[in-house]
Amino acid sequence: MAIVKIINSPRSQNLKGLHGVLAYCCRDAKTTHEGRKLITGINCVPQIALQEFMNTKRLHGQTGGRMYYHMVQSFPPEETITPESAHEIAVKLAASIPGFEIVVATHRDAHHVHSHFVINSVSFETGKKYHS
């Protein structure tokens, strides 16, 4: 059974932190499996997510405070799951959070398969901040 954790980081308060978490989560070496990149954007394009997140914040006057939420969904090492299946589950979970731009990136490089979620702290629909 998968578990989901919120990763609290002081870096979530600034643009440099947002850039860093997106770069880390989307690295080819961690997300490529059998020639396929396990990266999906929910309400955004992963390659330009930083710009899209910031455009949403500027549009709604929400450029201060927390920039993003970083969550990780992981499976125990003894659970047999393919990276593709883990990614599909992660994308479904992310899609259940309406109104937010989310990058989902599944890593297959550790002892267990896990997926990262980088969620814009501001809703593109309402302009309000996400509260976990």
How would you label these PLM feature ranges?
Residues M1-S132:
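N-terminal nicking endonuclease/strand-transfer module with a His-rich metal-binding environment
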